[in-house]
Amino acid sequence: MANYFNTLNLRQQLAQLGKCRFMGRDEFADGASYLQGKKVVIVGCGAQGLNQGLNMRDSGLDIAYALRKEAIAEKRASWRKATENGFKVGTYEELIPQADLVVNLTPDKQHSDVVRSVQPLMKDGAALGYSHGFNIVEVGEQIRKDITVVMVAPKCPGTEVREEYKRGFGVPTLIAVHPENDPKGEGMAIAKAWAAATGGHRAGVLESSFVAEVKSDLMGEQTILCGMLQAGSLLCFDKLVAEGTDPAYAEKLIQFGWETITEALKQGGITLMMDRLSNPAKLRAYALSEQLKEIMTPLFQKHMDDIISGEFSSGMMADWANDDKKLLTWREETGKTAFETAPQFEGKIGEQEYFDKGVLMIAMVKAGVELAFETMVDSGIIEESAYYESLHELPLIANTIARKRLYEMNVVISDTAEYGNYLFSYACVPLLKPFMAELQPGDLGSAIPEGAVDNAQLRDVNDAIRSHAIEQVGKKLRGYMTDMKRIAVAG
């Protein structure tokens, strides 16, 4: 099979990369009705599989779970989760032939095996659904021409998909129809009904493409969402300890600092995050972020280039074929880092202290968010897609670090995201070491003293922060998410 994106000509590539339309709420007036009375079978009962299924059932849809015979016979976790929640569970052979919509919510590396197993069992004219398009775009999976292929991609972990639905809301969602597989022209109706059944239409839905979702998703998770947080955690911890900070305090400042900082980011973008600083600290954070952007631009561009060309995917799939040797080695090495093994700090760190003593961390967030956004947009991805794959998801990933450090982040994210995270962080850490050596007192671990500031300089910095394109599009998109709850757990 050939990488689907690479089979397209340049015009087709640009058209699919640039497909992005914010859908009006009136387009979801029929809710999930298009799928009511039809049989929906979900393959996979992980975080997305279970929580999407719960939402869809609560929206009036007929949901069942198809699992491998071994998973049922051995009563594995997927079987237990589905049965304990009252769902019908059966083998592929028992459930797939009757399904009107088969939703594949297994991990990326299992998609080819799953699709090749279920496709011969699917009835003529059925639909196949994904929540991430890697299998279609990067693997180039060929789907029977009578099958409609759609995607509904919530821009949050599965647990958030469920919690927001229970509150009567939802999470922002991308939907798409694979242009090679829409024989009856009903793909968009299916995708809209599925998105409505998960509650996504209440928070905002983007009509996108499989290509745009995959390329932007890979870029976001490799750089700002996971790679930058991992590299920043390791660099900042080592810097603090080297300068005499108690390792336990340093660990807590970083572990919970990302979450506290990005909670402000979630509520009001980079503008609000920077406004939490004193004026002297804001000017310093801005200067540091500009330095970081200059240093890291080639690295961000390399990741985007390798994602667009398919180089990243081919390398990762080669590691899949080699029993994840690289991935497992990097995972083990990360677990042995000083940050991961540092003792816990029993004292309390106040919310403002995370900002005052984390100027460098704020600069890293600002630089990483803006660079990821800019690099995606420069590659033809529309601003709304770039926003969701950079700034929007960052607080959710930071929340995983607050739970159990980098270990938890790498457990929660997909293997695809974890592999890309390691590629980025292993390159970024040595790249930034000279920069770290030149830091000034007050950049990290201590507060910058109050002092006089130049009014014109402060005005210009404020204007630069607020006029960035990600702040403009973010303000619009956050208007649809004002009901989302705070997710911070730091005390």
Curated annotation (Swiss-Prot):
GO cellular component: cytosol
Domain KARI C-terminal knotted: from-to ranges: 209-344, 345-484
Enzyme's top EC category: oxidoreductase
A GO MF label: ketol-acid reductoisomerase activity
Pathway membership, UniProt: Amino-acid biosynthesis; L-isoleucine biosynthesis; L-isoleucine from 2-oxobutanoate: step 2/4; Amino-acid biosynthesis; L-valine biosynthesis; L-valine from pyruvate: step 2/4
List of catalytic residues: H132
SUPFAM superfamilies assigned to the protein according to its UniProt record, in alphabetical order: 6-phosphogluconate dehydrogenase C-terminal domain-like (SSF48179), NAD(P)-binding Rossmann-fold domains (SSF51735)
Keyword Oxidoreductase appears in the UniProt entry: yes
GO biological process, one term: isoleucine biosynthetic process
Stretches assigned to the KARI N-terminal Rossmann domain: 15-208
Entries under InterPro entries matching the protein: 6-PGluconate_DH-like_C_sf, 6PGD_dom2, KARI, KARI_C, KARI_N, NAD(P)-bd_dom_sf
Binding site for Mg(2+) 2: D217, E389, E393
Entry binding sites for substrate: S414
Alphabetical keyword list: Amino-acid biosynthesis, Branched-chain amino acid biosynthesis, Magnesium, Metal-binding, NADP, Oxidoreductase, Repeat
Catalytic activity, as annotated: (2R)-2,3-dihydroxy-3-methylbutanoate + NADP(+) = (2S)-2-acetolactate + NADPH + H(+); (2R,3R)-2,3-dihydroxy-3-methylpentanoate + NADP(+) = (S)-2-ethyl-2-hydroxy-3-oxobutanoate + NADPH + H(+)
Keyword NADP in annotation: yes
Cofactor descriptive note: Binds 2 magnesium ions per subunit.
Cofactor(s) the record lists: Mg(2+)
UniProt binding sites for NADP(+): C45, G46, A47, Q48, R68, R76, S78, D108, K109, Q110, G158
Binding-site positions, Mg(2+) 1: D217, E221
Chain's role: Involved in the biosynthesis of branched-chain amino acids (BCAA). Catalyzes an alkyl-migration followed by a ketol-acid reduction of (S)-2-acetolactate (S2AL) to yield (R)-2,3-dihydroxy-isovalerate. In the isomerase reaction, S2AL is rearranged via a Mg-dependent methyl migration to produce 3-hydroxy-3-methyl-2-ketobutyrate (HMKB). In the reductase reaction, this 2-ketoacid undergoes a metal-dependent reduction by NADPH to yield (R)-2,3-dihydroxy-isovalerate.
Similarity section: Belongs to the ketol-acid reductoisomerase family.
NCBIfam families in the record: ilvC (TIGR00465), PRK05225.1 (NF003557)
Official protein name in the record: Ketol-acid reductoisomerase (NADP(+))
Organism field: Salmonella heidelberg (strain SL476)
